[in-house]
C-alpha cells in the first residue's frame, strides 16, 4: 500500500470513528443519544488509536495536514511529499464525513437542533466571544 493511500484510509478511519461517536451522542433517536462528553472523548481516543495503529508502519500516521507540515518544517519529512499527503488526508476526511452522514441519514431529519447537527463535524463555542474563542483554539 502506498503511503498516500494509507494516509487517506487512516484519516477516513479517524473521521468515521470520531465523528461517528459524536453523531451517536448528539443526534436524536440514536442508541447513544445524550450519553455525554466522556463517550465522545473515549470514542475519539479509540478512533485516533485505531487509525494510528492501522497505518503508522506505512505512512507515519500523520492523519492531519498540520502534522505533515510540522514534520516537514523540522526536517523529518520531505517537502516534496507534503502536497500528496495533504490531498490524501483531505480526501480521507471528506470520505469519512460522507460515511458518517450516510450512516446517520435517518437521524438528521429527526434532529432539529442545528448546532447539534453541526457538532457532529466540527466544534463550536457554547458562548460566542471572538477573543476568548480564538485563545481557546490557539
Language-model segments: residues:
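Membrane-interface helix-loop junctions and terminal tails of multi-pass membrane proteins
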Residues: 1-138
Amino acid at each position: 500500500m502506498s503511503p498516500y493511500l494509507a494516509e487517506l484510509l487512516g484519516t477516513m478511519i479517524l473521521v468515521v470513528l470520531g465523528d461517528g461517536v459524536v453523531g451517536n451522542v448528539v443526534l436524536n433517536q440514536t442508541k447513544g443519544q445524550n450519553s455525554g462528553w466522556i463517550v465522545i472523548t473515549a470514542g475519539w481516543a479509540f478512533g485516533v488509536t485505531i487509525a494510528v495503529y492501522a497505518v503508522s508502519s506505512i505512512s507515519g500516521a500523520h492523519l492531519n495536514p498540520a502534522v505533515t507540515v510540522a514534520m516537514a518544517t523540522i526536517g523529518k519529512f520531505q517537502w516534496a511529499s507534503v502536497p500528496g499527503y495533504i490531498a490524501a488526508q483531505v480526501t480521507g476526511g471528506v470520505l469519512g464525513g460522507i460515511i458518517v452522514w450516510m450512516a446517520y441519514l435517518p437521524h438528521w431529519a429527526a434532529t432539529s437542533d442545528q448546532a447539534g447537527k453541526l457538532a457532529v463535524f466540527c466544534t463550536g463555542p457554547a458562548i460566542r466571544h471572538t477573543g476568548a474563542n480564538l485563545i481557546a483554539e490557539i
